[in-house]
Amino acid sequence: MGDERVAELINKTLHTKPADGSTHWSTRTLAGETGISKSTVARYLQAFQIKPHRVESFKLPTDALFIEKLRDVVGLYLNPPENALVLCVDEKSQCQALERTQPMLPMGLGYVEGVTHDHVRHGTITLFAALSVLNGAVLASCKPRHRHQEFLSFLREIDKAVSQDLDVHCVVDNYASHKHPKVHAWLAQRPRWHMHFVPTYSSWLNQVERFFGIITDKAIRRGSSKSVKELTKKIDSFVSQYNENCKPFVWTAAADSILEKLARLCGRITGTGH
């Protein structure tokens, strides 16, 4: 196939939409539109790494202090202060105690584990967690709600657990309970505590979110619990086992490289990146 037809195919894929109202092209619709075989269309899309069937979501930061906060948090990860413990702290709310209406079907040769679509709700809990950047260990506590009272209670648990000769640097998000006046008052009386807020809409900067993903996938999503007490017990057991073989998440991205990637994304959005 000549270069002109290849260019026509690529241009149509990138800059037009199907006439039938579809949101994106497929190899079948491109083949029908251009008269090129499906296998040839697929081969050229693969060669140019064009994937019209896929989409990725994004959220641009709106925080006026985005760069300052980014450098602050990334600096903690790459160059943690001496005589201090860096903790990534957050809560995972709405952990549901769901009881399946039928026993799970075990996995077997040729078929996966089966769970019923129906379930009985037995309430929710909030999982508070503090992940150590140094060694990956997690301090966790399940609480009935996620108000400032529960957050402050968890900070007290951290304060008792961390040696008094160490400063505590906490990476947190901008949830209202983290900035409550009573939380501020408690922190003001403890000079060893330092709070570092990630930029708005940038929870990906908080390493504890990675742990939340792990525990959700491995211990919560596919489980069945008859009560919040049973769910709490399962979470506590998972955290205990996790800490026996925990390893830190290794942060490698410098602040400048993140900002460069963001600039490229903005260029794509405005059309200057092509």
Walk through the language-model features, giving the residues of each.
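A short, amphipathic alpha-helix used for macromolecular contacts
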Residues: 1-40, 80-81
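Residue-level detection of the helix-turn-helix DNA-binding "recognition helix"
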Residues: 35, 46-50
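Short Lys/Arg-enriched helix C-cap and helix-to-coil transition segments
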Residues: 51-68
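Extended, low-complexity cationic-aromatic segments
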Residues: 69-156, 259-269
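C-terminal domain-tail junction helix/linker
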Residues: 100, 230-274
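RNase H-like polynucleotidyl transferase catalytic core
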Residues: 114-119, 187-207, 223-225
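Active-site proximal helix-loop segment of RNase H-like, two-metal nucleases, encompassing DDE(D)
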Residues: 138, 208-230, 241-243
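Acidic, metal-coordinating catalytic cores used for nucleic-acid/nucleotide bond scission
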Residues: 146-147, 170-181, 200-205
